[in-house]
């Protein structure tokens, strides 16, 4: 093939790589890989599979074209293209009709093929969502069988479940993927916590529908879908539109809404169950900032829920709002957390709380919630706070120590908090004026003999 390509096109195909056999990972036959016109192409034998009852890793042997087609997850993926006759070959006799009619169907009896490899359940959902296909009735019924859901838990490593979910989130219709997962009763199977963790949790799990509601509201905002609600401030949407990875994290976080009020014990105290969902339940971890940014979306909601301006009354409204926006749960570029999307997610959570048991949103209160956030963002812009969110302290720890004549330690951190609050109150003042103010604060009678100032509130509790 390599030589023929070079003879026909005059181009180079590059080196031919061999992917070795690895029976422990279901690689019983070698694969050759070659670059063809800038695309990596795998050359493989036709294969047949034999499954053991307790494993999804099959024994693979060289097979016939029909055997190879039947082992595919859905019929449209079982289509062949014959390079000699330049024609399509539909050995299952269902692939082309299903492609025309928009149906996702398994080539074999769905109950058996899902028992053999339960991951095919998620692949079927992913492809149906990607192409906007309907899942065949018998295929959907098999997905709902308890034996299949048990097999999905027993046979499939959580990393593989997480990989399939990430592909859904990166696809064109992540919301459709989530609603399909919920429709066929595998929401807890995909997102939930194992029994050994569930038995130790505190708090109450919300209905699965809250995850779908949250994702639906979020996607309607991100995609500018007309609803009865006012449009969110454009500043809340800008970052998510520019960063596709951030959009994925927001939708994933919305899907975890049912577990938002739950914690589980660890050696260092109680941790949010949503952190377990991401890190252990789906083994997604730190890739693309899913950890820690997804759990921090929920932490930010606790800090920023319904941020009406009357909650920021004080000597300096600019400082109070600025301290909230600088909070590490609300904004931290190193972890992929941005203040605008933290507020957007918080607004979505507040709106979900307004949906009653009949799945009806209180439109009057919902419009009020959106207006509160829009007014808040307008005030952030009026106060020119965006540039102050990531501004470093005017004085670092070493400079504070030199100005006040104190040694490194906890006291430095206390004064650092004061410096940050001061610069939020006085955005245009000089470093020298900050030093003068800091000396006066340190020497003021209110500090007593120790010279240690009482730290300002690090966060605006709203």
Language-model-detected regions and their locations in the chain:
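Catalytic cores of the polymerase beta-like nucleotidyltransferase superfamily
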Residues: 1-462
């Amino acid at each position: 093939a390599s030589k023929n390509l070079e003879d026909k096109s005059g181009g180079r195909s590059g080196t031919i790589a061999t992917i070795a056999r690895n029976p422990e990972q279901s690689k019983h036959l070698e694969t050759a890989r070659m670059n063809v016109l800038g695309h990596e192409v795998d050359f493989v034998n036709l294969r047949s599979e034999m499954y053991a009852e307790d494993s999804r890793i099959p024994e693979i042997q060289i097979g016939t074209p029909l055997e190879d087609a039947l082992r595919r997850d859905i019929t449209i993926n079982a289509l062949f293209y014959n390079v000699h006759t330049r024609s399509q070959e539909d050995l299952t006799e269902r692939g082309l009709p299903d492609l025309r009619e928009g149906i996702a169907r398994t080539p074999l009896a769905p109950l058996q093929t899902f028992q053999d490899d339960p991951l095919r359940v998620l692949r079927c959902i992913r492809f149906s969502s990607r192409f906007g296909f309907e899942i065949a009735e018998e295929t959907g019924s098999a997905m709902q069988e308890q034996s299949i859901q048990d097999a999905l838990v027993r046979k499939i490593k959580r990393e593989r479940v997480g990989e399939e979910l990430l592909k859904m989130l990166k696809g064109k219709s992540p919301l459709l993927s989530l609603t399909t997962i919920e429709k066929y009763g595998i929401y807890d199977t995909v997102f939930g916590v194992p029994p050994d963790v569930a038995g130790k949790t505190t708090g109450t799990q919300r209905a699965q529908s809250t995850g779908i509601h949250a994702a639906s509201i979020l996607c309607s905002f991100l995609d500018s879908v007309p609803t009865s609600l006012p449009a969110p401030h454009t500043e809340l949407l800008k970052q998510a539109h520019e960063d596709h990875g951030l959009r994925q994290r927001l939708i994933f976080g919305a899907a975890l809404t049912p577990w938002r009020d739950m914690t589980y014990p660890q050696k260092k105290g109680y941790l949010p169950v949503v952190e377990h969902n991401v890190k252990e339940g789906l083994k997604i971890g730190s890739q693309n900032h899913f950890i820690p940014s997804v759990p921090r979306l929920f932490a930010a909601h606790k800090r920023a829920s319904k941020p009406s301006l009357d909650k920021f009354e004080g000597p300096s409204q600019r400082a109070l709002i600025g301290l909230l926006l600088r909070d590490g749960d609300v904004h931290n570029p190193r972890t992929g957390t941005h203040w605008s999307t933290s507020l957007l997610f918080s607004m979505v959570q507040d709106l979900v709380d307004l949906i009653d048991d009949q799945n009806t949103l209180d439109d009057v209160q919902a419009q009020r919630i959106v207006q509160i956030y829009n007014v808040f963002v307008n005030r952030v812009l009026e106060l020119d706070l965006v540039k102050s969110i990531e501004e470093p302290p005017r004085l670092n720890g070493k400079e504070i120590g030199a100005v006040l004549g104190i040694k490194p330690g906890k006291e430095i951190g206390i004064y650092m908090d004061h410096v940050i609050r001061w610069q939020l109150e006085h955005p245009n003042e000089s470093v020298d004026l900050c030093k003068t103010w800091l000396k006066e604060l340190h020497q003021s009678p209110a500090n007593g003999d120790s010279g240690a100032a009482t730290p300002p509130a690090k966060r605006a509790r709203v």
